[in-house]
Amino acid sequence: MSSRTELTFTPPVMEVGRWIDGKDFSKLPLINVSQAAPVAPPPRPLIEYMANAIQEDSTHLYGPVLGLPELRSEIAKQWSRAYGDTIKTTQVGITSGCNQAFSASIAMLCGEGDEVILPTPFYFNHKMWLDMAGVSTIALPCSGKMIPDPALAASLITGRTRAIALVTPNNPCGVEYPPNVVMAFYQLARKHRIALIIDETYRDFHSALGMPHNLFQQNEWDETVVHLYSFSKAYRLTGHRVGALVTSEKRLGEVEKFLDTVSICPNQLGQKAALWGMQNLSEWLKGERLEILRRKQAIIDGFEVLSDKGWQLLGVGAYFAYVQHPFSLASNELCEKLVDDLAILTIPGTMFFPEGDETGKRQLRIAFANISTTEIKLLFSRLAVASE
């Protein structure tokens, strides 16, 4: 009989990280495009604020399970402005990172043997948590443009379906789901009285300046929508683990049970930093967004050198480019070979699909947020000489 953790696979970032253990990259420097996280610390003004905040007694004590009221209120205020409707403070909860927000959502929505629909390729940590929770993942294959089809999703709904989970902008594909597609999924979920979990971790790097969707403008949206967010990317607070969950007050009452049992309260320093960032770093964040968009454009402009070799750019946006390689070699073997031959570390598409799905063997993810436009050109020049 397997334990809960034995029901799932090894974390992909850790697994591919072992490929570089003991390797010498002094002659050919490693290009690491495996992990979607800022490697730089928070901006200096935020670090200085945190240095002062750590002197406050409250920073070191337990706080409310659902997070600091001031941070919940600020999210409600800014989200209401961004999405064009009123979100209440009581509809906002703070979690220890966005992965915990997803875990809490599943604990609140699902029981043993229930089902959640995930578009494939999926964000692997979502699949891992569903495995460990005893919840079945129902794969929803995406189209060639990496957009999930609501009509196909409808055919997958059963009496055990409890939620559809979307990530937009997407991880691993980078694709921004059009508002009409998001709305179609909302209507589908509402019709079947299931939840629509929408993870918007990369919302701050969306290419459009307007509302990415209008879910929050729907009557009684909180009976269907479970919105997830991360402060890790926006303010480089990866190590401080601060996320958010927005849904109905009733559902947050159930989420509170999970959070109180697992972590008691979110990190106080991280919450204070997130609040200060929201109130003081809007212009800085705009600059971060523009830089990510410049790198996205560098991916698009520079990909021709790979297209000529048979590669295909399947999706690009936020922190990611998702590509198809031209070789017969499976992507998990190819990616390990890229480390040895070309000093490139990336994650193969096989790690974004259920076991037995052959689709990922031709695909891989490039997390480009941590490399410059110059390094993007270097990456492509190396990939252009890749071989089996």
Task: List the predicted regions and their residue ranges.
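N-terminal small-domain helix-loop-helix segment of the aminotransferase-like
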Residues: 6-97, 104, 278-280, 387-388
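Walker B catalytic acidic pair
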Residues: 200
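Conserved glycine-rich beta-strand-loop-beta hairpin in the small C-terminal domain of fold type I
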Residues: 275, 292-300, 312-325, 362
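Helix C-cap/helix->beta junction micro-motif
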Residues: 26, 133, 191-192, 342
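PLP-dependent enzyme catalytic core of the Aspartate aminotransferase-like
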Residues: 77, 81, 154, 337-346, ...
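Conserved core segment of the aminotransferase class I/II
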Residues: 221-290, 300
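Conserved core of the PLP fold type I
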Residues: 59-187, 204-208, 212-219, 374, ...
